[in-house]
Amino acid sequence: MKKLALSTLLLCGLATSVLTAQQAAPVDRPAEPNLVFDDDGGKVQIVPADLSTAGPKTFHGGPLLRSAQQVSIFLGAGWGDQQFRSREASLLDVGATAGDPHVSELKKHNIRTLRAMPRLEDFSDLSRARVNDLTIQQKLSDLLRSKAIPEPDAGTVYVIFLAPGIESTLGAHRGGVDYAAYHNFVNLEAGEIHYVVVPFHEDAERHSSAATRAFAETALNPNGQGWF
């Protein structure tokens, strides 16, 4: 009888411990749709891997970009391969995509899309380790410090296209599995930097669509308090 009672107490204790651990575990993502936590705990808006939308956007009282101008950064050794490099032309100015509903939404909010700035190709080999958001921020800082890319003005959006073979992560989330693209911002010596990260996708149309949507969402929700 004593053994039965002891076993029951042990089972109850185990169940309580499991429940407590589950309750104490951090929430993997914010309550808002299409937002996740990044590597330092901030909220980041993603384009889901299936490109699904979350319904009508709601305004949260914050600023929008008055204009948006793309600066493309083709990052990774894979872009040096001609079969992939030829795709760059279709990605250089996603804000000029005719008939795209996300670009049309910018016009609805009187956000101008300016002609894209010249691209930068950086063929660094980043295939041996995961590239997280902090890696991206450090790369932007290095490129700005070396003047490899133009310093930002109020409407600059750096769009970073990752080469095939690069494994992108954002907090606990994986590029191509949990998101097709995302946008974020960071304060560096050059000022407030708005940027988009687009993991490579074999399907050129989906690749371009993800980049276009993330670019538009950057202008509509640059600091996390706009339209989303």
Where are these regions (language model features)?
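Short, well-structured alpha-helical segments in soluble
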Residues: 141-150
